[in-house]
C-alpha cells in the first residue's frame, strides 16, 4: 500500500474468546513507512477487550522499536564501519610499531579486531539514544496511540467464517465440506487486505505445498496435512480459514 491509502488493523475474536490481530507491521524498515501513514484505522467484529488492545499496543511499540533499530543501523552503518575500520588500523599500527615488547602478529590482529568491534557496538548504542532517534521514537509511539478501532460488519462475517473452522471437530473437514460460502457477503478491498495479512502468517514453501495438497484433493492429503500441522505446531483452524477465504476471493476474480 502506498500514498495516503488507509491501512487497516483487524481484530478478530476467536471461538474460545481469545483475540487475533491482523496487520502489516513486521518490525522491519517498511514498518516505519506504514506507521507514518496518516490514515491507520482499526476494525473489529465483536467488541475487543481493553486488555487485548493494551497488549496489542505494546506489541506495536516493540515492532516499532525493532524497525527503528533497523533504520538507524542502515542509516549510520557506513560512518560507523569506516570509523571502526580506522580504529582497527590505528590499533594494529600501534601494537606493531609503538609497543616495545614484540607482540605476535596474530595477537595484534585479534586485539585490533576486538577494539574495532567494541567501537562499532558502542557507536551503535550511542546512536540509538541520539536525539534524532528519540524524536522518531516519540513520533512513532504517538502515532500508535492515536489508532482508533471501530465496528465493521465485514469483520463480523469474517469472524463467523473463522468460528466455523474452529468449532468443527476437524478444521480440514470444514474446509473441504461443500457448504454455503461463509464469506458470500464479505466483499471489497477489506477482504483483500485481510487475505494479504493472513498470507504474511503463512509465507514459506511448506505452507504452499500443503495448500496445493488440500485444494487438489490429493489422496491422503488431509491426513498428511494434519500430521504436518501437529509436527510444526501450526494454527490449523486459522490456516484453513485462510485457504477458504483465498479460494473464495480467487473464485470471484475468475468469474468477474
Regions found by a protein language model. Name each.
Residues 71-147:
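Transmembrane alpha-helical hairpins and terminal membrane-anchor modules
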Residues 23, 37, 101-103, 181, ...:
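Intrinsic-disorder/low-complexity coil detector
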